[in-house]
Amino acid sequence: MFDVTRYATAAQSIVEAGRFLYERGWSPATSSNYSARIDGDHVAITVSGRHKGQLGAGDVMVVDLHGQAVQSDCRSSAETLLHTVIYQLYPEVGAVLHTHSVKATVLSRLIPAGQALELEGYELQKAFNGVQTHEGKLIVPVFDNTQDIPALAEETRDWFARHPEQPGYLIRGHGLYTWGRTMADCLRHIEAFEFLFECELETMRVRR
């Protein structure tokens, strides 16, 4: 069982995040999926196929940390395991967001296979939890898109178990995943990534 009040709070944070992200064009149509931790065993997550700018309480369901629905006949996103693996790895994480912005999608296709996006020298790197200086380096791995979500979940688990300080990743031609202790932290990370992605794309354009 899970606490209904905590579920309602988590669901409301997801609804509000959906409006925020849709208004900025980072989660068009029914793309993207969002989640928030309820407790050590349960997560609130968006129901599959729902328009993220028009979410209501009925568009958020509960799953356990294995991605199984709890007290619901609804179907969560096919990518639910990409959320739950982060909650399993990091007990302190309170929210995970997956967006489909143009910049994240395009940039993910420009990074050569087998390479990661490296961000350094940007003052805005300090927007991420735990980052104190622009002199460090953020490494954003780019995983190939696949319909085999369990395999992709394990790939992300292996990488982030070895790099717990990194705050997100890209899926090629697909979008961004990031997380934070709170939904507010997570939304701040999305904004920071979007700014940094735009800087990288503009740098590539100027250098051509």
Curated annotation (Swiss-Prot):
It is an enzyme of class 4 (lyase). One of its GO terms (cellular component) is cytoplasm. Zn(2+) binds at H98, H100. It catalyses: 5-(methylsulfanyl)-D-ribulose 1-phosphate = 5-methylsulfanyl-2,3-dioxopentyl phosphate + H2O. One of its GO terms (molecular function) is methylthioribulose 1-phosphate dehydratase activity. One of its GO terms (biological process) is L-methionine salvage from methylthioadenosine. Its EC number is 4.2.1.109. The keyword Metal-binding applies. Its cofactor is Zn(2+). Pfam families: Aldolase_II. Keywords: Amino-acid biosynthesis, Lyase, Metal-binding, Methionine biosynthesis, Zinc. Pathway: Amino-acid biosynthesis; L-methionine biosynthesis via salvage pathway; L-methionine from S-methyl-5-thio-alpha-D-ribose 1-phosphate: step 2/6. Binds 1 zinc ion per subunit. InterPro entries: Aldolase_II/adducin_N (IPR001303), Aldolase_II/adducin_N_sf (IPR036409), MethylthioRu-1-P_deHdtase_MtnB (IPR017714). PANTHER family: METHYLTHIORIBULOSE-1-PHOSPHATE DEHYDRATASE. Catalyzes the dehydration of methylthioribulose-1-phosphate (MTRu-1-P) into 2,3-diketo-5-methylthiopentyl-1-phosphate (DK-MTP-1-P). Belongs to the aldolase class II family. MtnB subfamily. This is Methylthioribulose-1-phosphate dehydratase. It comes from Marinobacter nauticus (strain ATCC 700491 / DSM 11845 / VT8) (Marinobacter aquaeolei). The lineage of its organism: Bacteria, Pseudomonadati, Pseudomonadota, Gammaproteobacteria, Pseudomonadales. The gene is mtnB.
